[in-house]
């Protein structure tokens, strides 16, 4: 038994350039970057026997800008109704609440909601299979990664202001949640309780995006008796920064046995991998290891491309 349903979401809105950890020069380039990431993620999951579905607010725009990817991906257009302040950083990531609502109302026995800049590089570990069998709710704890860069006290203060009570700081990454529909439904309901408070407290003062309100919601669920396990030690998911970082990150060889790896700064590397059309299960890990060193040249090239608006890469 494997979690047969993996979901990602892509909210599109012109003039709200919500690209994260990547240089893009236009709305069109943003769409194509994230769609190519979704495509290589989908291929890697399919190579290991999993299905991937992309949730979006504008399937017509996806079809217009990337018709081939639109045909290949399983895409569902859903309602995105979360009120998001215009101009806020990470604008589109706020709509994760709508993806939580959607999965809370689905009939899947078990599903995972993941970021698009990820790869499936191994067979699902037994711990994930057991989590599905038992209906275990999962998240990914990145406290040891985020505290060195953001500081423990600002993170704790933000959550305590949102929730109105003291908390034991455990910070989850936005790239991975898995569980039965009841878990996603409970998360959505918890976010709805504190969302406006999150906006009032955070905009202009603290971190913004889906991570802060997701963490507040998980804290509410724990307070209400939910048992939510960390998928990181299970080997289910890991975040690898392909650049110097403030936390103690091991070399990439320590990530080779993970099921899913999140690659926040490697969006252009993932796009390059897609052009090479890997298909065998083992080829995704091999190809990433061979091309990961290109992240900086690709980032610089795409930044120049975005500024000039006329640069074209010729094969």
Where are these regions (language model features)?
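N-terminal anchoring/stem segment of glycosyltransferases
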Residues: 1-84, 107, 289-315
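Hydrophobic anchor at the start of a short beta-strand
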Residues: 51-53, 111, 225-228
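Active-site donor-binding segments of glycosyltransferases and PAPS-dependent sulfotransferases
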Residues: 58-96, 247-251, 255, 265-283
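Short beta-strand-to-loop acidic/aromatic patch adjacent to the donor-nucleotide binding site
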Residues: 100, 108-119
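Long, low-complexity C-terminal extensions of enzymes
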Residues: 244-315
């Amino acid at each position: 038994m494997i979690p047969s349903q993996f979901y990602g979401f892509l909210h599109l809105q012109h003039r709200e350039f919500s690209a994260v950890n990547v240089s893009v020069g236009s709305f069109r380039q943003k769409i194509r970057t994230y769609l190519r990431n979704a495509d290589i993620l989908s291929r890697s999951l399919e190579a290991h026997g999993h299905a991937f579905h992309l949730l979006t607010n504008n399937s017509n725009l996806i079809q217009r800008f990337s018709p081939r990817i639109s045909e290949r991906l399983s895409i569902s257009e859903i309602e995105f109704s979360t009120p998001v302040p215009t101009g806020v950083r990470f604008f589109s990531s706020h709509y994760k609440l709508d993806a939580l609502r959607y999965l809370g109302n689905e009939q899947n026995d078990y599903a995972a909601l993941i970021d698009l800049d990820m790869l499936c590089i191994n067979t699902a570990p037994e711990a994930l299979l057991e989590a599905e069998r038992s209906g275990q709710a999962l998240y990914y704890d990145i406290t040891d990664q985020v505290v060195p860069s953001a500081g423990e006290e600002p993170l704790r203060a933000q959550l305590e202001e949102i929730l109105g009570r003291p908390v034991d700081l455990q910070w989850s990454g936005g790239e991975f949640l898995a569980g039965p529909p009841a878990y996603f439904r409970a998360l959505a309901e918890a976010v709805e309780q504190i969302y406006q408070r999150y906006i009032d407290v955070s905009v202009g003062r603290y971190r913004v995006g889906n991570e802060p309100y997701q963490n507040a919601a998980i804290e509410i669920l724990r307070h209400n008796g939910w048992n939510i396990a960390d998928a990181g030690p299970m080997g289910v998911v890991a975040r690898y920064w392909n650049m110097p970082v403030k936390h103690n990150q091991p070399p990439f060889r320590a990530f080779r046995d993970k099921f899913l790896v999140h690659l926040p700064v490697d969006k252009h590397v993932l796009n390059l991998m897609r052009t090479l059309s890997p298909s065998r299960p083992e080829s995704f890990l091999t190809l990433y290891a061979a091309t990961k060193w290109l992240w900086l040249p690709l980032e610089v090239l795409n930044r120049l491309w975005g500024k000039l608006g006329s640069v074209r890469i010729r094969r």
